[in-house]
């Protein structure tokens, strides 16, 4: 049997990075799903596939959504938070998150306004690829 190479959890890495980065700049909940009791502001991260681009690097497509239900400032604050999240993810390139090595964050789509169709809550969404070392 050959060497066993296992990819780290991309969701755990992304949620950890965003929680830590936002905690000192713009504190709010970061989760992999919409919380049952919605806070007024929160961020969700979901995995939308990906690929093994070589034997040592996994490229995981992530969808990040930023929500803010403030009737006056929600849209502009959600956009600002989405832009901050992009910067936080970009800054992880070449770092370690726990025992996971982040090779880089590659943006696929900039934040786009996408209000929640059920509630009308302002929401911005962006996508990108988190490239992680497989070990």
Say what each PLM segment does.
Residues 1-54, 92-98:
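Small/polar-rich, solvent-exposed N-terminal microdomains that initiate assembly or binding
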Residues 1-13, 48-57, 100-135:
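Short, charged interaction patches at domain edges and termini
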Residues 39-41, 58-62, 122-124:
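A generic structural signal for short beta-strands and their flanking turns/coil linkers
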Residues 66-72:
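Structural beta->alpha junctions
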Residues 69, 90, 133:
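Residue-level marker of positions within ordered structural domains that often coincide
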Residues 72-94:
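Mid-chain, well-packed structural core segment of small domains
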